[in-house]
Amino acid sequence: AYGYLNFTYRLYTFPWIKFDNFEQVLNNFYASYFAGSLLIPKNKIVDELKKIFSKDEFCASDFKSLLSKYNASPETVYQRLTNILPHDFNIKNLFFLRFSYDKKTDDYALNKELHLAKEQSPSANETNEHYCRRWVSLKVFKDSIANSSEHEFDAQISNYPDDEQKYLVLASATKDPFKDHVYRSISIGIGIDAQLSKKVKFINDENIKKFDVGITCETCSIQDCEVRQAPPKVLDKELKEKETADAVEKLIKRYS
């Protein structure tokens, strides 16, 4: 891709060690897009998706077969879907996430995210809060380790009660090729609305796993969560501040 596009400002390492200017990063994006298009031809994957979307029942093996059909990593296929779904299916309410998981430290890190149309609920936090363990993006790590699988795939419908948003989330986990104790997960979330129900027939399949989820434990209002990692201290603080503000307002009204 770099050669065909005649880019002289480019990156020579993966992962990136450093970049000297924005043009190198931009050219890397263009080259990656071009290479992905060559590896995953548009017409072929569009036809495959139409077949999958036309079925009344969700079948995980259909998606796993799609992800392994090309000479490309699951991440490349998921990235290609962020191009294909908006352009050919008019499905634009999407997010793309890449997590890493360190088995030694039990740490999760969100190191790549893309939001189309708007910033959706699952997004990075900069305050070391605990990401929701109900996300399929994180659950596939444990499944991958337990099953010793090279490619672990799963899907669920994630419901965000506080935002009144629902997403069909597809996720894949693989081992990091450079570090034995590190794993990666790639996921794509598709916003569920009336239009999606017309395009994806299996979206109402009762067999698809469904979970109420939050963003981080510290901001989550879900009660009795079996995988909560921390109390909802941010939410508790906001509620306490609101109670104080309401009490002050009542006093002002009473004595004014």
Where in this protein do the model-derived segments appear?
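Conserved binding/catalytic microenvironments
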Residues: A1-S256
